[in-house]
Amino acid sequence: MGIKIYNTLTRQKEEFKPLREGEVRMYVCGPTVYDYTHIGHARTYIAFDVIRRYLEHKGYTVLMVMNFTDIDDKIIKRANETGEDPKELAEKFLKYFLEDMKALKVKPADIYPRVTEHIQDIIDFIRKLQEKGYAYEGSDGVYFEVRKFKDYGKLSKVKLEDLVKGARVEPGEGKKNPEDFALWKKAKPGEPKWESPWGEGRPGWHIECSTMSTKYLGESFDIHGGGSDLIFPHHENEIAQTEACTGHEWVRYWMHTGFLMVNGEKMSKSLGNFVTIREALERYDPEVIRLFVLQRHYRSPLDYTEEGLEHAKNNLERLYNTLENIRVAMERAEISFKWGEEEFEAYEAIRDGRKKFYDAMDDDFNTAEALKAVFEVSNAINRYLTQVEKPKESILRKAWEFFKMVSEVFGIFEDYFREQKAGEEEALIKLLIDVRAQLRKERKFDLADKIRDELRNLGIQLEDTPQGTVWKRIKV
């Protein structure tokens, strides 16, 4: 069975078929960098990080783009409040965002395009819309004429007549109809501005993502993601302007994360009920936050509670205890000449757990169900280790490989496995140094030199000192 993805556009799960075999091109809406990023945002970016990791684990080459909105009404407003330069303010919070993502072990996007570095691309996109009759110039900017795009509402299921009902154009607005949205905003005194065919100004919000995604991923690509709050109007407007420009389908699969809730309300800066990522990281390990997010399906609402985070913390400790139990047991493990009932039970638990994990992740990246499989394997291995005096090396190796796979997909245990690998490498190097010393004692210098030379080819340089042989890593 292949991967199935819930497509917001069709409101159903669909078999995942990328446009290009073996390659996935995906775009995730990035932040407007005017403040610290909160845990609600972290939920979205961790979810798409795991989706990307799983696609890569399944053998796809993934090209991932995430934009930065570094000029916007919110940035200008905050800069006016603080007295900072809007560019410097945006640069500061962009840097903080990247630091937060690194702390949360979210893999960097392949490309992070910034709005301010793509102004000419945006102008060119708007001109195409004008040429095709979808955009017009008003007194205060350039607008997209929504009524001319016949498929408007296909993502959000919003009806145009409902938008128009009771709405009106505010005095001073230069648009024809209340539902039309800005593509280019003419500059107000003191605002950042760029030259354009319509006078000095800056881009509207929605046009940025259409321009930058098509520039780097093409006029059609596989996945567009973001939080559920972006479905309307942002993603709806993106579809309208992009498909009006290109004349064909833009994105094949639309994916949206559920809200992070606090006391029954969506966590948001506007409601003032948010916890920044930095505040959360002061209290909890990054892997606790990742596990907290993964305990719920990415489309389901997630309640932000101390109890939930403590539960994730305890679960993470349980899994680390299992890893340590396996590592320690390796020291007394024996080669398998025959299996008993305990080995067959442990093997079947690992086999079944792996299948359940893949089945869950193939079913619209259901991390909650996949985690259940992880704990089933964890419990089975701990039970096995209490049942036998000398565990079989083959069983422990299969369990170890299972948890390495989980680490690769979920982005947890990565430092642990890295340290274990480093420890194994050091032990092997020490063994080779001891073998080489023995060969030198036996005057088998050719073989001793071969060990030295081969290690050097691998980036390990041996140095013979009066105190013994030492080693260091070198570039080769």
From Swiss-Prot:
Its EC number is 6.1.1.16. InterPro entries: Cys-tRNA-ligase, Cys-tRNA-synt_Ia_DALR, Cys-tRNA/MSH_ligase, Rossmann-like_a/b/a_fold, tRNA-synt_1_cat_dom, tRNAsynth_Ia_anticodon-bd. Binds 1 zinc ion per subunit. One of its GO terms (biological process) is cysteinyl-tRNA aminoacylation. It catalyses: tRNA(Cys) + L-cysteine + ATP = L-cysteinyl-tRNA(Cys) + AMP + diphosphate. ATP binds at K269. Its main location: cytoplasm. Zn(2+) binds at C29, C209, H234, E238. Its cofactor is Zn(2+). GO terms for cellular component: cytoplasm. A motif ('HIGH' region) lies at residues 31-41. GO terms for molecular function: ATP binding; cysteine-tRNA ligase activity; zinc ion binding. The keyword Ribonucleoprotein does not apply. SMART domains: DALR_2. Keywords: Aminoacyl-tRNA synthetase, ATP-binding, Cytoplasm, Ligase, Metal-binding, Nucleotide-binding, Protein biosynthesis, Zinc. Transmembrane segments: none annotated. A motif ('KMSKS' region) lies at residues 266-270. It is found in: Cytoplasm. It comes from the Archaea. Belongs to the class-I aminoacyl-tRNA synthetase family. This is Cysteine--tRNA ligase.
